[in-house]
Structures are given as C-alpha cells and as structure tokens.
C-alpha cells in the first residue's frame, strides 16, 4: 500500500497539470454548455471557436485570452457530473480522478452536451485541456470522439504545472480521425497575454 501511495503521489505531481491551487475556480465554468458568441468570429483563420475543458480555471484563463485575441466564440466542455475538489485529489487513491486513471474503462466521461451551436460553420477550433498524467484529460478525449472535425483546422493548447504538451495533441488527432491538426502549445499557470498572442500569431 505504501508503494502504491508513493506512486500515486509522484504521478499526481504531473496531474497538477491544469489544476490551480485556488480551489474556488474548480467548477467556475461547469454550468456553461452553450457557445458564447463574439461580435464576429472572423480572422485570417476563418470563423474561430475556442472549445475547452478546465478543471481548475487555468485552462479557462488561456482560453479566454485566445478568444479575445482571435475574436472567437467559446464553448465549455462540461462533464455531466462535474469534478469537485475531492474528485481532483490526486493524492487520494480513492478519489474519482485516480480511480479513473487506474481504470481506463471509467475514462469515457458523459458530457452535459456535445451539441456545439453552428459547429459546421467553424473553420478553426482551438481545443484546450489540462494535462493529466502526461496526456490530455479524458474529459476532452470524450468530446473529441463525439465530434466531426472534417474541414476544420484544430489547434490544441494545454495547461500544466511542469509537463509538456507531449503526444497529447497527436493522441487526440488519432481519436478524432478527422480534421487538420497542428502542433499546439502548452502553457503554465503563469502564462501572460504576450505568450498567448505569440501562440495565436504563430498559427495565422
């Protein structure tokens, strides 16, 4: 048991990925399922959507910066059963997220909705998620498996404390099976607006 607990603690450090130390942000966006429209969604990338899942608020912060910079609409990917602080306690081997990590059959997450308004009208989708155990959160994987990205350019972005983007974008591309996927970017919790602007300009 001690070895198992130690292993969970070590992998849990990587899980901190998109998890902020500010607990109050954990479910701040959990009830938002509709796409929020910008005044225009048009840039050099065509009509843009920023779709994201944020466990603690870090991914949401980056998503909003991207949306502001691209004049994009936003869509919050929301689990039907939102994650609580206790659910996200990586150091507790009985917590929801650890149980899901250790049991891949539990990683197909029911979402509140996958019906993105005017989905077919978007040319570019920025797809945001926290890194959990060196890969994309399985919440966003469940979203990707439900959507058809045909004809769209998909640009992943992730948040983590220390882990890089790794193969998370490539793994999502394989799950999707459609769309033109770009390399993507990983941001820390301290990422600035300038960091985000460089990321966006590099994808125009």
Cite the ranges covered by each PLM segment.
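Active-site-proximal alpha-helix that buttresses catalytic centers in soluble enzyme cores
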Residues: 2-8, 20-204
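C-terminal motif of bacterial Sec signal peptides marking the signal peptidase cleavage site
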Residues: 15-18
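Long, proline-/serine-/threonine-rich intrinsically disordered regulatory regions
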Residues: 11-12
């Amino acid at each position: 048991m001690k070895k198992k607990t130690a292993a969970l603690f070590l992998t849990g450090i990587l899980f901190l990925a998109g998890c902020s130390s500010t607990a109050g942000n954990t479910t701040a966006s959990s009830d938002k399922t509709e796409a929020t429209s910008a005044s225009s969604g048009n840039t050099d990338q065509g009509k843009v959507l920023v779709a994201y899942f944020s466990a603690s608020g870090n991914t949401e912060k980056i998503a909003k910066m991207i949306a502001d910079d691209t004049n994009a609409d936003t869509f919050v990917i929301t689990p039907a059963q939102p994650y609580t602080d206790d659910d996200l306690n990586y150091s507790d081997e009985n917590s929801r997220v650890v149980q899901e990590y250790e049991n891949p059959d539990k990683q197909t997450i029911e979402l509140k909705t996958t019906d993105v308004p005017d989905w077919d009208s978007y040319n570019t989708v920025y797809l945001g998620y926290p890194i959990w155990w060196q890969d994309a959160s399985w919440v966003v994987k469940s979203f990707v498996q439900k959507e058809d990205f045909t004809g769209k350019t998909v640009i992943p972005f992730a948040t983590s404390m220390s882990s890089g983007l790794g193969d998370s974008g490539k793994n999502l591309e394989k799950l999707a099976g459609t769309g033109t996927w770009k390399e993507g970017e990983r941001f820390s919790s301290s990422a600035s607006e300038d960091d985000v602007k460089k990321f966006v300009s590099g994808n125009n």
